[in-house]
């Protein structure tokens, strides 16, 4: 029996699984190297880093002030109180900040194509996606992340959410799903650059625009916007629906919808693969 088990482990399926594990471990190790290189490069100019991060923090702080003064005059927005809107805002800003920190390479992809860097990426025996991710890690966006954490923490003190284990888990799913969603949008932006060479400004509506109007629950904008944010670009699946679950107003399966943000990566990656196949070298 032991011989049979040993034989099964060395069969085609076992070797395939072992190969996948080794490949994943190799990719993680490579990304770790990229991460450390980018961190060391950033820390060469500590003053610039801290001032830029502080600027990111202060530039985003007007969001909190705007909400504070608005709720001083109006007690509710639709059916949402001050603490509930702050919770929504804090979560979305954390999602966007994480995506912008670690997926910044895709947002700068037009320059990667223009200066011929992608030619070098193509001839290396590693994932092109992983290499582009490692081209730029924007640590200065941590200033915005700190502000988002402060808003989130403050929302806990003024809100009325009855936190439970399931709601904490859904909150974590929201962060993961939202980060994946925004990373997917950056990936779409990069894929379009294969055909246009330059990035298209309208994509900012899906990134920076979503960051702005996603600070409030999507249902306040009307049914059409909610439908778009559910079935086209699933912002609502990582914000509105799971937020209802956390607030105790939604169905249990709303807590599963942040997974749509991860699933959204699949069509984004397929579009990327189409772009890679159509890529023509700059010749530089």
Go through the PLM ranges and name each one.
Residues 2-284:
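Hydrophobic transmembrane alpha-helices and immediately adjacent juxtamembrane helices
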């Amino acid at each position: 029996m032991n011989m049979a088990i040993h034989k099964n482990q060395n069969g085609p399926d076992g070797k395939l699984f072992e190969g996948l594990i080794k490949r994943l471990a190799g990719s993680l190790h490579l990304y770790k190297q990229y991460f450390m290189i980018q961190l060391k490069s950033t820390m060469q100019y500590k003053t610039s880093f801290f001032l830029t991060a502080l600027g990111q923090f202060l530039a985003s702080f007007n969001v909190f002030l705007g909400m504070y003064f608005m709720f001083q005059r109006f007690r509710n927005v639709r059916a949402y109180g001050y603490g509930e809107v702050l919770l929504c805002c804090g979560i979305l800003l954390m999602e966007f900040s994480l995506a912008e920190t670690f997926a910044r390479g895709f947002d700068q992809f037009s320059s990667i194509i223009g200066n011929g860097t992608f030619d070098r990426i193509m001839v290396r025996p590693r994932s092109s996606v992983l290499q582009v991710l490692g081209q730029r890690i924007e640590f200065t966006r941590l200033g915005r992340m700190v502000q988002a954490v402060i808003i989130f923490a403050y929302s806990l003190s003024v809100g009325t959410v009855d936190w439970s284990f399931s709601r904490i888990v859904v909150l974590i799913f929201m962060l993961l799903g939202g980060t994946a969603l925004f990373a997917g949008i950056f990936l779409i932006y990069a894929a379009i650059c294969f055909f246009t060479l330059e990035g298209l400004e309208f994509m900012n509506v899906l990134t920076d625009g979503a960051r702005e109007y996603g600070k409030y629950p999507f249902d306040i904008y009307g049914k059409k916007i909610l439908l778009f944010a559910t079935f086209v670009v699933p912002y609502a699946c990582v914000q509105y629906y799971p937020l209802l679950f956390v607030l105790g107003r939604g169905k249990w399966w709303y807590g599963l919808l942040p997974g749509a943000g991860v699933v959204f990566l699949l069509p984004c990656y397929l579009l990327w693969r189409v772009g890679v196949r159509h890529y023509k070298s700059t010749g530089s």
